[in-house]
Amino acid sequence: MLIKSILGKRPLWGKDCFFADNATIIGDVAIGDFCSIWFNTVIRGDVNKIRIGNNVNIQDGSVIHATYKKSSTSVGNYVSVGHNAIIHGCTIDDFVLIGMGSIVMDNAKISSNTIIAAGSVILEN
């Protein structure tokens, strides 16, 4: 796993997390307890903060990023992010499934107990 500080910010994570060998986590990122970050995932808090709750599963090839000076990214508790999804500058509440290959864009808000179908594109609310 590649862990990289940027602008004095270093990723932090809680207890009992799994990180695949080639996952990349950069900058102002905080990950809760009991999370799994799978192969080829990139979580890049280089331009704004990223906060990930407890019991979150981010599957292979996913990208989580934020929007420069505008939107941080927040992922709640008990969230599953499917393979190759893109989460960018948005808020995802608790108990959400983001389907494989989905894109959740800047300023979108996904409410609790929501399922996003595979391949969906969610734009700003």
Give the positions of each predicted feature.
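Left-handed beta-helix
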Residues: K15, A20-D21, I26-G27, G32-D33, ...
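Phosphate/pyrophosphate-binding betaalpha-module
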Residues: K49
